[in-house]
């Protein structure tokens, strides 16, 4: 039976980096790790409640967290920064207040910056969120997968694979369907492969979405 390894964890320390960049003492490590999780959840919940709707999706590719003794610095990599900037009341200022409440008990400062992703559809997280939004709007899954591949291929990637699992089109029995275009060398460490799994909440239940994107080979 084949054993599958996480594509990002497999390359961590070689061509992939951690999303949290800090050191801590052993007695406070777990607390800071939990705080990182809460900060990321706060950002994603804000996007889901105040930015995302039937036609817009958040477009968050990743969130990097840097820490100093009295400073927490967030880098939010997004393909569509205008969605967060255009409405200041519900946008960055509201998000900043929510995050500050989570770290205020340590009297630390918060610095938050937006980094624009120039080719958003080369990011599997953004592509998976697009697929989830379409599935939640009851678009046929095969049409969604083909459209997602078209969006990704415009950005000159080497290969892509999309898998959707669950009660597809409301079927009684759950199954998984996938489509692949181009190369996807999962066992090559030098292959710059990005991966994401994302849930889609439909009226028939939760569908699981997985996206693999092969950008280039690192020499």
Curated annotation (Swiss-Prot):
PROSITE patterns: KH_TYPE_2. GO terms for molecular function: rRNA binding; structural constituent of ribosome. One of its GO terms (biological process) is translation. The keyword Ribonucleoprotein applies. Residues 47-118 form the KH type-2 domain. Keywords: Chloroplast, Plastid, Ribonucleoprotein, Ribosomal protein, RNA-binding, rRNA-binding. Pfam families: Ribosomal_S3_C. Its main location: plastid. The keyword Ribonucleoprotein applies. It is found in: Plastid, Chloroplast. GO terms for cellular component: chloroplast; cytosolic small ribosomal subunit. Belongs to the universal ribosomal protein uS3 family. NCBIfam families: rpsC_bact. Part of the 30S ribosomal subunit. This is Small ribosomal subunit protein uS3c. It comes from Chara vulgaris. The gene is rps3.
